[in-house]
Amino acid sequence: MPLENQTIDPTAQRAFALNLDDSIYGNFAEIGAGQEVARWFFAVGGAAGTVAKSISAYDMTVSDAIYGKTKRYVSRDRVVQMLDHEYGLMHERLDGLRGDRTRFFVFADTAAAKSFSGGNDCHSWMGMRFQHAVRSKTSDILLHVRLLDTTNARQQDAVGRLGVNLIHAAFHHWKSPRTLIEALLDNIGRDRLEIDWIHVSGPAFKDVDNRLLCLHLVRISYTPALLFDTDGTPLLASESIRRSRVLIERGRFAPVTRLNLEMMARGRIAFESDTSRNTPSRTAPHTADQIATGERGESHDMHDIHEIMEITMNNLRDRGSAEDADFLARVDLLSAVGKMVLVSDIGAFHSLGEYLAERHVEQTGLVLGVPLLRELFNESHYKTLDGGILAAFGRLFSHSVRLYVHPTRDVLDGRIITADTLTVAPHLSHLLEHLRVNGLIRGLICDESTLRTYSSDDVRSRICSGDPAWRELVAPEVAAHIERNGYFGAACPQAPDTRPIMNQP
């Protein structure tokens, strides 16, 4: 039905505006969830001004004949194949006819919507290749989205609206990529779609850092977390850590300290021992010192256990706001010591466990210090959660999660506190003992005579004050990066409260 004869819908308005722009012309290729994006342009009227071609190669054999064989049909590789094929054909057929007055584009998506039998992961890969100016080189936008609606029809509707928003935003907001991202869920909502990965490339985005775009997805609550590889490259968590063992340590890491690395190394030894009974390990044995310093040996397989340092948005805002430069510095330093990074807006540990379970992580180990374990037994954090602390712990440990607790030295009397000697409120002591006896909370072993307790803020304060002793508290690679790039030395605000952060559930 033409736009003038129906109630004005924001998505319809955008599709109609694109149809009226005679400089924009392109192809649509959609697999799965119907042809929901192209449908909007036909429904509002004037589609001849925008749509050169619309195709849906739904049958796998037909799809392979057109785009080539693929291992997975709902994948980034398939979307790129579709963009390559469709844009090549369009350019060959139409460039000579209207290339001097047209900004060509191809939109492609491949989706796995809710099936008749149910039980499948509902998600979509979506891509856009376009000219930001007449005769310009092409630029690409690729994104992954989780479909959160509970019915196939609603998921199709959400995919259609997102596709229209993407095309409209690409042509109208390419100069401001963050504005482009913020426009994607207009008239859809975060309760229906989760955009958990994005990548842009080409001349329209020549100065854009994709790490910062992905951080923005977390900052504006388009996704609860985003994973970065050991070289800082944004990853899709549901692919990168699927069916794997994951060991996570939460902290500020501004900068990452020797103690952080020692905790992770000791946690890995215990986690590997616990989980190898069910998961064959291909990893050669190591000492904590070897792992912490990067001396892993030739037979080490980093894909066996993913070591991830998690920075929550609260920790990233520890000095007021989540500044881009500060974020990049932390990721850079963690990359220097070979760690993956998870930036999350997930406060409660049980919510983190659920996030990882949704990404099909097989087993999870959480490395933490005694102070944070003590905070986990602070019932005030669970006031708004039905079932309180019992519900929180039940949700946490129901997803194959274990806690690995590093000892600490009491700052007042110097005594060593471990997971076994920690005391909590009397009415919670039996809960703590139950978790310890059943191996869900495990104490890590270290040489207590050399145990030092210090934080990232202590190191940062030493850097700011010019105390050279800070170099002893970080790995050599970290010290080299800090000195080379001038991290943390330019601005030295007062350090925040360093007590463990526990967000409300």
Label the predicted regions.
Residues 2-505:
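Nucleotidyltransferase catalytic core that binds NTPs
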